[in-house]
């Protein structure tokens, strides 16, 4: 039963389901490494992947033209030096199911496997041309669905069969339909959630609400019975297609909570999960641990000889649950709702033994960075590592892995589904947060640079939140090497895609409409709103590469940059409430408006039931 509804699964390689388990250590025992450079795994993989991206770029520029300029000849000329060629990253923001679906629309638009995506006016092949892709919170759910299901397509995830993935009409509260690959009813679903987490706790590991949240997410995101109990994030590195460099390297992003603090600030540590490692380039830790052996008792960067290797801690559901742990807070208000008392009793029984001080975090027990970099790390004395939702520091677009100087990313396509405004539209807050962090006097940015962006009011007043915009076009005006950022904010092209972050259920029609709207946002309605849009995307991709090779940009690129690059103009006047009009025909049944306090409380109360 390898496939269901056309969706393949990855590797269920955890030794004992959700329970982290002692295994024999490899001959070379795992250690924590310095973040001074990329891992040998990543550099070796890049040698393979960059060759694949060259081929993909040639295909992409076969249907995306840059005026009369022969991009294919340019790529051939520099094919012997991969560092001269464009290096592309894609970032998909958080924002719950809204972010998953809007981000899915962009990824669908970028995927050459999507029907008609390589036609004139479309952007199919950009995904295949990318080296890296990152997601946090709702964006991490999208990445998890795609990668754990063997780099499947968004089309195949848009299922219509009961019990299949992405059947969001059944909320996480209800659990999956008993049809299809799932064989359990709601009662069995709740029991499975509790049993999995209880097994981890009995094995001696700290557990929090994030464990149950991550297990619940797995039923919606992974095409496997019982929510893919044995699927790990590190298993991505073991899939032959990834090893062959056939698709981009995925990152899930989360934040650290500083010891003794509850508020996540701009100087918080930003972690990444990649297929091989967990860690950060930030100076607070500046280290990475082998992801496969999370849960092992590292001390001072090594594993003592009397300690076993642990595997299975990096459950794929736990990883994407960690990145979206903000939702934990909405699981705690059940007793303020009018839900039946027997439901509250069951829920509270599950929560009874969980640490009440850690309701909003994921507990990484033991801390893999215990006594590591003791002279500089505030986490070195902590036996447990508190990790939280990747957007809690305001950086809701996961740019951090993509702006690391060692990765040399030229251009980032930043898909922003944030709910910054009263009506749940983005206003650039995430980009502002990343820019301000790069200037933070604490040194937390650790040498990363980011192009200048304006304040949030300017984003709205200049229309930078209603259409794609470019930042960092003039690299000579940067504080350090930084990528050009193509900002793609969620906007209403044909559907009100601004559903609440905490809307827990979405029927297939709304799901598909939001995905279609996201496709239209990324392609500017298949270039019907700008005949030169795909050429302008191409110019953004080529810009840094042309600079390195001393190549003059074609005239059309100058026109594109005049049109899409922020020119430094600021208008900080406080705007009226931001409620953008449709670009295309309205396919919505009704406009999405500001929710009432009652509806927000009801949604929050329902979310609590995820842990029943």
Swiss-Prot record:
Reaction equation(s) it catalyzes: a 1-acyl-sn-glycero-3-phosphocholine + H2O = sn-glycerol 3-phosphocholine + a fatty acid + H(+)
GO biological process, one term: glycerophospholipid catabolic process
Modified how: N-glycosylated.
The organism's place on the tree of life at top rank: Eukaryota
Stated name of the protein: Lysophospholipase
Domain PLA2c: 24-571
Organism encoding this protein: Penicillium chrysogenum
EC number, as in UniProt: 3.1.1.5
Predominant location: secreted
Glycosites: 41, 81, 116, 150, 223, 267, 306, 335, 427, 440, 446, 477, 498, 526, 532, 567, 571
Compartments, record wording: Secreted
Family note: Belongs to the lysophospholipase family.
Cited function: Catalyzes the release of fatty acids from lysophospholipids.
GO molecular function annotation: lysophospholipase activity; phospholipase A2 activity
InterPro entries with a match to the protein in the record: Acyl_Trfase/lysoPLipase, LysoPLipase_cat_dom
Signal peptide: 1-9
GO cellular component terms, A-Z: cytosol; endoplasmic reticulum; extracellular region
UniProt keyword terms in alphabetical order: Disulfide bond, Glycoprotein, Hydrolase, Lipid degradation, Lipid metabolism, Secreted, Signal
EC top class, as a word: hydrolase
CDD domains assigned: cPLA2_Fungal_PLB
């Amino acid at each position: 039963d390898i496939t269901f509804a056309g969706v393949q699964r990855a590797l269920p390689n955890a030794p004992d389901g959700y329970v982290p388990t002692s295994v024999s250590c490899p001959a070379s025992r795992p250690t924590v490494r310095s973040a001074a450079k990329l891992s040998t795994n990543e550099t070796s993989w890049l040698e393979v992947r960059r060759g694949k991206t060259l081929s993909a770029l040639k295909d992409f520029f076969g249907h995306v033209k840059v005026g009369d300029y022969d991009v294919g000849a340019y790529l051939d000329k520099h094919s012997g030096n991969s560092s001269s060629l464009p290096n592309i990253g894609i970032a998909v923001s958080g924002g719950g199911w809204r972010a998953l679906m809007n981000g899915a629309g962009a990824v669908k638009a970028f995927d050459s496997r999507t029907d008609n995506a390589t036609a004139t006016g479309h952007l199919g092949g950009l995904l295949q041309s990318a080296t890296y892709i990152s997601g946090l919170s709702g964006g991490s759910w999208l990445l998890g669905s795609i990668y754990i299901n063997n780099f499947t397509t968004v089309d195949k995830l848009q299922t219509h069969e009961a019990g299949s993935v992405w059947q969001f009409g059944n909320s996480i509260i209800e659990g999956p339909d008993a049809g299809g690959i799932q064989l359990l009813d709601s009662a069995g679903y709740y029991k499975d959630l509790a049993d999995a987490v209880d097994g981890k706790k009995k094995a001696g590991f700290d557990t929090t609400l994030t464990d149950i949240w991550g297990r619940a997410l797995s039923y919606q995101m992974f095409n496997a019975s019982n929510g893919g109990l044995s699927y790990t994030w590190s298993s991505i590195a073991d899939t032959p297609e990834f090893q062959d460099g056939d698709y981009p390297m995925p990152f899930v992003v989360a934040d650290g909570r500083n010891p003794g603090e509850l508020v996540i600030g701009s100087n918080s540590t930003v972690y990444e999960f990649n297929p091989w490692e967990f860690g950060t380039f930030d100076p607070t830790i500046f280290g990475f641990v082998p992801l496969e052996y999370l849960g092992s008792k590292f001390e001072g960067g090594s594993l003592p000889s009397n300690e076993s290797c642990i595997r299975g801690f990096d459950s794929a559901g736990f990883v994407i649950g960690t990145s979206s742990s903000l939702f934990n807070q909405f699981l705690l208000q059940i007793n303020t709702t009018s839900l039946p008392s027997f439901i509250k009793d069951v829920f509270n029984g599950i929560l009874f033994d969980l640490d009440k001080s850690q309701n909003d975090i994921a507990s990484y027990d033991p801390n893999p960075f215990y006594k590591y970099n003791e002279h500089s790390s505030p986490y070195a004395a902590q036996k447990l590592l508190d990790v939280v939702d990747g957007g809690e520091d305001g950086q809701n677009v996961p740019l951090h892995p993509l702006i690391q100087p060692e990765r040399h990313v030229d251009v980032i396509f930043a898909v922003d589904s944030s709910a910054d405004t009263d009506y749940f539209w983005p206003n650039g807050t995430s980009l502002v947060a990343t820019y301000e962090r790069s200037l933070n006097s604490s040194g937390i940015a650790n040498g990363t640079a980011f192009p200048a962006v304006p304040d949030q009011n300017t984003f709205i007043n200049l229309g930078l939140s209603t259409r794609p915009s470019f930042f960092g076009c003039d690299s000579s005006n940067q504080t350090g090497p930084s990528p050009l950022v193509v900002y793609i904010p969620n906007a209403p092209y044909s559907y009100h895609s601004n559903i609440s972050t905490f809307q827990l259920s979405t029927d297939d029609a709304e799901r598909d409409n939001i995905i279609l709207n996201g496709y239209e946002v990324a392609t500017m309605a298949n270039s019907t709103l700008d005949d030169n849009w795909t050429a302008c995307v191409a110019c953004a991709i080529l810009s840094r590469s042309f600079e390195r090779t001393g190549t003059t940009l074609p005239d059309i690129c100058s026109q594109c940059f005049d049109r899409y690059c922020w020119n430094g103009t600021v208008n900080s006047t406080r705007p009226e409430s931001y409620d953008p009009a449709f670009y295309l025909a309205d396919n919505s049944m009704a406009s999405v408006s500001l929710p009432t306090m009652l509806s927000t409380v009801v949604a929050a109360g329902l979310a609590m039931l995820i842990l029943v």
